[in-house]
């Protein structure tokens, strides 16, 4: 049985978060953790936090199944766009530039299975 973890309203642009999500898609959980720990991207900290939550949710939903990190696989991971906060930056000649502070929603689903071969 699969388990899911969702991280909402993360103050990172979805484009930057999707780069990190693509690194661990289809990988085993222990490999994904190693990739994220060695990543220099700031978004990798939030992804590893959500990945740990998904593994804990799997253990909670399946108490009889003692699956380790090497048995669980990141089945699906996707990033949706969250609400955008709009700010104004003063510009020359009485104008204003719009600054869009983007956010995103991260969803990770883990399940027992084989990693996806590329």
Swiss-Prot record:
SUPFAM superfamilies: Ribosomal protein L22. Keywords: Ribonucleoprotein, Ribosomal protein, RNA-binding, rRNA-binding. InterPro entries: Ribosomal_uL22, Ribosomal_uL22_bac/chlpt-type, Ribosomal_uL22_bac/org-type, Ribosomal_uL22_sf. One of its GO terms (cellular component) is cytosolic large ribosomal subunit. This protein binds specifically to 23S rRNA; its binding is stimulated by other ribosomal proteins, e.g. L4, L17, and L20. It is important during the early stages of 50S assembly. It makes multiple contacts with different domains of the 23S rRNA in the assembled 50S subunit and ribosome. This is Large ribosomal subunit protein uL22. GO terms for molecular function: rRNA binding; structural constituent of ribosome. GO terms for biological process: translation. HAMAP family: Ribosomal_uL22_B (MF_01331_B). Belongs to the universal ribosomal protein uL22 family. Part of the 50S ribosomal subunit.
């Amino acid at each position: 049985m699969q388990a899911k973890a969702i991280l909402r309203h993360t103050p990172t642009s979805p484009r930057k978060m999707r780069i990190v999500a693509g690194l661990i898609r289809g990988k085993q959980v222990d490999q994904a953790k190693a990739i994220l720990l060695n990543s220099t991207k700031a978004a990798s900290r939030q992804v590893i936090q959500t990945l740990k939550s998904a593994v804990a949710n799997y253990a909670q939903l399946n108490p009889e199944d003692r699956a380790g990190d090497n048995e669980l696989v990141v089945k699906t991971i996707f990033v949706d766009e969250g609400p955008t906060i709009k700010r104004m930056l003063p510009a020359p000649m009485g104008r204003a530039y719009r600054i869009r502070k983007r956010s995103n929603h991260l969803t990770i689903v883990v399940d027992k299975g084989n990693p996806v071969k590329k």
